[in-house]
């Protein structure tokens, strides 16, 4: 018996689209208005700074000759498919997990688009304290981290099934 998509976690796929629109829109604005390396202060400890990342988080494998582009693209596709299957197998009422999965998929697809279209990921958020700067990142990275944090949080919450 087939189930309605609205009764599964796939009901939350709209959030993937929202993450993609916001992420790709922010990257488009950076590409149209900034030269590589340009910085604009927003608030104390927060700048907009156009950087290119040819690797993964913290520029991991950025200087590896180009193969990493396809490696990380494959990881993004694989994770997105696995999480979409998990969403399909979960109930729409399992909000925290489905929101987390949608955020991760949206972020992964946003960075995947950059890797395939530009050959690098557009980063623009520069958080700093004094002279110390955290690695420059983007909104897709933020969505992935928030999604991962929600999965960890869900692991600490009491299960409703155990209460019944």
Curated annotation (Swiss-Prot):
Residues that span the membrane, as ranges: 12-26, 70-88, 96-113, 142-159
| Topological type in the membrane | Multi-pass membrane protein
Q: Which reaction does it catalyse?
A: Release of signal peptides from bacterial membrane prolipoproteins. Hydrolyzes -Xaa-Yaa-Zaa-|-(S,diacylglyceryl)Cys-, in which Xaa is hydrophobic (preferably Leu), and Yaa (Ala or Ser) and Zaa (Gly or Ala) have small, neutral side chains
Q: Name one GO molecular function term.
A: endopeptidase activity
Please name the PROSITE patterns in this protein's record: SPASE_II
Please name the top-level EC class of this enzyme.
hydrolase
Return the protein name: Lipoprotein signal peptidase
- Organism, by scientific name, is Escherichia coli (strain K12)
Q: Source organism lineage?
A: Bacteria, Pseudomonadati, Pseudomonadota, Gammaproteobacteria, Enterobacterales
